Amino acid sequence: MKMKNLFDITKKVIVITGGTGILGRHVAAYLAEQGAVVVIMGRNSGIGEDIVNCIRTSGGRAMFLETDVMNRKRLEHNLKTIMAKFGQVDALLNAAGGNMPGATIPPGSTIFDIDTEDFKKVLDLNLIG
């Protein structure tokens, strides 16, 4: 196998969580440029649709699904949507992350100042999301 074909992602369906964030949107654009079909998941539908439109304008294939990665039922629903449309998921890129909205983590806090449940939510978002 030639090296240039080893990492060919043409027509591969790649799902990106956190796809409306800074990292996710740039990775989505690059993967689409390389020929992948990009499924962008994120919380901001306006930004998500803008990214999809930019990718499509450049000749790429993309779709957006509004998603909060902390909502497992929504993730399962979106996976069914992706499978119905494309029949496959070839790769998953987890770019979701950050602090939990509403978490009580004051600036300058140490790990010992953070509520245990809030800390678990932040870990879930950044490690599992």
Predicted regions and their residues:
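A glycine-rich helix->loop->beta "capping" turn
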Residues: 58-61, 81-94, 100, 115-118
